A protein has these predicted regions:
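A short, active-site helix/loop in glycosyltransferases that binds the activated sugar's phosphate group
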Residues: 132-179
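Alpha-helical membrane-targeting segments
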Residues: 51-59, 113-144
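A short, Lys/Arg-enriched amphipathic alpha-helix followed by its capping loop at the start of a domain
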Residues: 1-6, 19, 234-238
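Conserved nucleotide-sugar donor-interacting segment of glycosyltransferase catalytic cores
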Residues: 62-127, 168-169
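Short internal beta-strands
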Residues: 7-13, 241-246
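Structural motif
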Residues: 80-81, 160, 209
Length: 250
């Protein structure tokens, strides 16, 4: 956007300030200045059940989103367009301000299958799940006296939803509405980039490795060697080389 003459402002967690500003992009901090990685790891560490752990982590993130709406609202003022991330921050605030939005979805599973015919039972179950997902966003909508959203689709942009995933990596869901568009991966070419020597040597020593990236699941409050061992043994058994994200304490 900047290269094409647009003046952009990126709002995110305070921990990203240095990285974003080093790329010559204007930045505004949103939310509390806490160690998200550590907090998520602590929450996950208190629950042995992975599903319960995931739900508690999501509630933690949603709570931050709800409490940060005032900061988001101020950051959105005066903008011509709001690009909304998969967390939907900025969507409701843009609606209140009358500013058009474009969505960027990193998790295609969150996109509603509006074109799919549903049985009565599936409609009932789907409506319940959709209502639960929309619940934290309805807390924000209530602050601005907006009608509750029945599902996440009512919050998402009806203009464009850009999905930065390659069509060769994942098939487009035929039940999505037309404005959900696969764009291919967004990687900026860095002509002068040189990988670290250790990484460069590893890549040259054999077949292309698999990259295992687990997002917040790999954040650690304390060493989780057993979990890391599980992945390492799986790669050893299948004979694949791998690069594993996270697990710094293990």
């Amino acid at each position: 956007l900047n290269k094409n003459g647009y003046d952009t402002l990126l709002g995110s967690h305070p921990c990203w300030k240095q990285l974003i500003e080093s790329s010559n992009v204007k930045f505004v901090p949103i939310g509390p200045d806490i160690d998200i990685e550590k907090e998520a790891a602590v929450i996950r560490g208190k629950n042995k059940n992975p599903m319960l752990s995931m739900l508690k982590t999501m509630n933690f993130v949603f709570d931050i989103i709800v409490k940060s709406t005032g900061e988001v609202f101020e950051a959105c003022k005066g903008m011509d367009l709001i690009v909304v991330s998969h967390a939907q921050m900025g969507a409701t605030e843009a609606e209140v301000l009358g500013i058009p939005t474009v969505n960027v979805t990193l998790q295609p599973e969150m996109i509603p299958e509006k074109l799919k015919k549903q049985t009565f039972i599936k409609k009932v179950i789907g409506s319940f799940i959709a209502g639960q997902i929309a619940k934290p966003y309805n807390k924000i909508r209530k602050k601005y006296n907006l009608k509750p959203a029945k599902d996440i689709g009512m919050i998402m942009s009806s203009n464009y939803d850009l999905i930065p995933i390659s069509k060769y990596a994942k098939e487009r869901n035929p039940y999505w509405e037309p404005h959900h568009v696969f764009t291919g991966f967004w990687y900026q070419d860095e002509k002068d980039y040189q990988p670290e020597e250790n990484l460069d040597n590893f890549l040259k020593r054999g077949d292309k490795p698999i990259l295992l990236a687990l997002g917040a699941m790999s954040f650690e409050d304390k060493a989780e060697v057993n979990k890391l061992d599980m992945f390492v043994k799986a790669f050893e058994k299948t004979g694949y080389r791998a690069i594993v994200q996270g697990f710094q304490k293990s």
